[in-house]
UniProtKB/Swiss-Prot annotation:
Residues reported to bind Zn(2+): 29, 32, 48, 51
Cofactor stoichiometry and binding remark: Binds 1 zinc ion per subunit.
Gene that specifies this protein: accD
Source organism superkingdom: Bacteria
E.C. code: 2.1.3.15
Name the record gives this protein: Acetyl-coenzyme A carboxylase carboxyl transferase subunit beta
Spans annotated as Disordered: 295-320
Cofactors demanded by this protein: Zn(2+)
Statement: the UniProt record of this protein carries the keyword Ribosomal protein: no
Molecular function in Gene Ontology: acetyl-CoA carboxylase activity; ATP binding; carboxyl- or carbamoyltransferase activity; zinc ion binding
Subcellular localization: Cytoplasm
Keyword list, A-Z: ATP-binding, Cytoplasm, Fatty acid biosynthesis, Fatty acid metabolism, Lipid biosynthesis, Lipid metabolism, Metal-binding, Nucleotide-binding, Transferase, Zinc, Zinc-finger
Top class in the EC scheme: transferase
Length: 320
């Protein structure tokens, strides 16, 4: 027995109690590997506070944090996917749909809402990448067209946040048809002179990038988002050449003029509100002043309610 074993008698060593930490309190950044407090990450809209890596965010949460609180109404929620072709690969399409719905609590890969953005009426759509890779299918196309129709009816701008791997192969030609369908709908927005802002997030690929994602009056992207038609590996294997560093990332596309601007997610709401206000000649400052004035009036009323009542009769007697 060594001297260290004599000092550290195993019989006297008690096992330390494991810390009782609830699951999901901490998470790790996909980029820098830093351990992050989950609540802090959620407050920062799933953007790493250490390295600014933009993680995936659900479509519903994106829209609820982007639009004014209490102003949202969901559109097209009654539309559900159907396995018309009875498609089957390694798994039945209807089983894939059921699994995706259970995982995401969404009926399909696009969520559409109308509401206000800093009191300005807008319609917004967002892809849910966790639903079969955000793939575009019949319901996605129908909901997007519904969003366009609502924007035309309300005479307001349309915003779409894309996060998709492309067309959904399980719906074959019906999925590819959505490229033409959504593009034709956006042509009506152009005819009416209504702004359409496309926001491309990581990733925006395939048929979505080749249709609705690149047809914005202003094309915006989040930092380091992968945007393109075919993936980098497919292109390298086809052309048999090494691609440039950062190829198909939003910074590369901005440099080449393929997109108009890059906006960080926490700043997206303010930036797009200013853009739309300029495009529609909407007086954003006036609404903000009115809102501030209403808040000040409410504060004055609340403070006056809390002031002690003055008994005039009692004061008169004291003066005498």
């Amino acid at each position: 027995m060594s001297w260290i074993e004599k000092i550290l008698n195993k019989s006297n060593i008690t096992s330390s109690r494991k810390a009782n930490i609830p699951e999901g309190v901490w998470t790790k950044c996909d980029s820098c590997g830093q351990v992050l407090y989950r609540a802090e990450l959620e407050r920062n809209l799933e953007v790493c506070p250490k390295c600014d890596h933009h993680m995936r965010i659900s479509a519903r949460r994106r829209l609820e944090t982007f639009l004014d609180t209490g102003s949202t109404t969901e559109l097209g929620s009654e539309l559900e996917p159907k396995d018309i072709l009875k498609f089957r690969d390694s798994k039945k399409y209807k089983d894939r749909i059921a699994a995706a719905q259970k995982q995401t609590h969404e009926k399909d890969a696009l969520v559409v809402m109308k509401g206000t953005l800093k009191e300005m009426p807008v319609v917004a759509a967002s892809f849910e990448f966790a639903f079969m890779g955000g793939s575009m299918a019949s319901v996605v196309g129908a909901r997007f067209v519904r969003a366009v129709e609502q924007a035309l009816e309300d005479n307001c701008p349309l915003i779409c946040f894309s996060a998709s791997g492309g067309a959904r192969m399980q719906e074959a030609l019906m999925s590819l048809m959505q490229m033409a369908k959504t593009s034709a709908a956006l042509a009506k927005m152009q005819e009416r002179g209504l702004p359409y802002i496309s926001v491309m997030t990581d990733p925006t690929m395939g048929g979505v990038s080749a249709s609705l994602a690149m047809l914005g009056d202003i094309n915006v992207a989040e930092p380091k988002a992968l945007i393109g038609f075919a993936g980098p590996r497919v292109i390298e294997q086809t052309v048999r050449e090494k691609l440039p560093a950062g190829f198909q990332r939003s910074e590369f596309l901005l440099e080449k003029g393929a997109i108009d601007m890059i906006v960080r997610r926490p700043e997206m709401r303010d930036e797009l509100a200013e853009l739309l206000a300029k495009l529609t000649q909407y007086d954003l400052a006036k609404d903000e002043d009115e809102l501030l004035g209403e808040e000040m009036i409410a504060d004055d009323i609340e403070s006056s309610d809390n002031e002690p009542e003055i008994n005039i009769e009692t004061n008169k007697k004291e003066d005498v």
